[in-house]
Amino acid sequence: MAADGTGVVGGGAVGGGLPKDGLQDAKCPEPIPNRRRASSLSRDAQRRAYQWCREYLGGAWRRARPEELSVCPVSGGLSNLLFRCSLPNHVPSVGGEPREVLLRLYGAILQGVDSLVLESVMFAILAERSLGPQLYGVFPEGRLEQYLPSRPLKTQELRDPVLSGAIATRMARFHGMEMPFTKEPRWLFGTMERYLKQIQDLPSTSLPQMNLVEMYSLKDEMNSLRKLLDDTPSPVVFCHNDIQEGNILLLSEPDSDDNLMLVDFEYSSYNYRGFDIGNHFCEWVYDYTYEEWPFYKARPTDYPTREQQLHFIRHYLAEVQKGEILSEEEQKKREEELLLEISRYSLASHFFWGLWSTLQASMSTIEFGYLEYAQSRFQFYFQQKGQLTSSPSS
């Protein structure tokens, strides 16, 4: 996700001081399976990509000519634009510089410059701890990251018991990290309030967005959600806040037992544990590889069953509770409490991404049915809210 202000979007010029000799269309390698819409890079942006690689990576990147650099889309996100930049084989390495990197260009800006600075700091810390890709360069329009031989998980793989358990363990470790950021859990409602205000401040031409606000009484509903969550105990931990299949890489390391890596930390913050787990469960429903409008497929019946949730929860708690000895009764009590916590915070996930997508519809140039997606999330919100209020345990 990108933040408030001006950002680089698909096809937009980003300027640069390179000579205006034409970049040739370097042949891209076989495309990596796209989770979302891939984006092309304009000629001006290609020149700028060359300049960033040359300046921040040095070595062989300074020797390659602009037309020799391969810049290929890898997987279009709903927030950022991602490209794989590669050196040609005939240009030898000089030292330890990478031969290929991931270029991330911030898309429609929703957060603010301060958030981008914090994200870059966070990214660097996680890289130093070997919990994320290496960071090679940061600039106002984006950054250069380590390109990892890997693939993102597919939506259907989230329900695989082995992978689900591994994701739970990875999430628990992430939650256990100490990070140099505010520990006050203001991110969730602070961000949703900002999104709602930005939607309400849209020009009168943005009628569909305003209709959504009125149709679902979003301001009143947010207050109702806040009251519900105020009455729902949930530990404040360092959360990823967007653990969906596209942000979980399966590394190409067959000999490694720990071959999952979380990426894309732009939403990460101290937040309520229930949101991170509930949000992940919501993502079981949405497949973003659908090739026709609106470029996603929602399958509400794929939301994890009670048993699938318990499978995840038990792996999560096993990591969190290492060294603790609990009675069977106490263990069951923790599991039931966490089930309720997650069911309530999953509502916040739908509400958050519904607002986010409503706002993106007015800003993003990425080909995606943002308004349709927003409506789907709000509909699922009310459906799950109804199930929650009718449940005896709620």
From Swiss-Prot:
Its gene?
Chkb
List the residue ranges of the region (Disordered): 1-42
- Domain of life according to the entry: Eukaryota
Write out the similarity annotation: Belongs to the choline/ethanolamine kinase family.
Tissue spec. comment = Expressed ubiquitously with the highest level in testis.
Keyword vocabulary terms for this entry = Acetylation, ATP-binding, Kinase, Lipid biosynthesis, Lipid metabolism, Nucleotide-binding, Phospholipid biosynthesis, Phospholipid metabolism, Transferase
Region forming the signal peptide: none
Q: What is this protein called?
A: Choline/ethanolamine kinase
Q: Which InterPro entries match?
A: Kinase-like_dom_sf
Pathological association? Defects in Chkb are a cause of rostrocaudal muscular dystrophy (rmd). The disease is characterized by rapidly progressive muscular dystrophy and neonatal forelimb bone deformity. The dystrophy is only evident in skeletal muscle tissues in an unusual rostral-to-caudal gradient.
- Null-mutant phenotype, please? Hindlimb muscular dystrophy. Hindlimb skeletal muscle tissue exhibits impaired phosphatidylcholine biosynthesis and increased phosphatidylcholine catabolism, with concomitant accumulation of choline. Mitochondria are abnormally large and exhibit decreased inner membrane potential.
Q: What's one GO BP annotation on this UniProt entry?
A: phosphatidylethanolamine biosynthetic process
Metabolic or biological pathway: Phospholipid metabolism; phosphatidylethanolamine biosynthesis; phosphatidylethanolamine from ethanolamine: step 1/3
What quaternary structure, including any partners, is listed in this protein's UniProt entry?
Homodimer, and heterodimer with CHKA.
UniProt-listed Pfam families: Choline_kinase
Q: Which reaction does it catalyse?
A: choline + ATP = phosphocholine + ADP + H(+); ethanolamine + ATP = phosphoethanolamine + ADP + H(+)
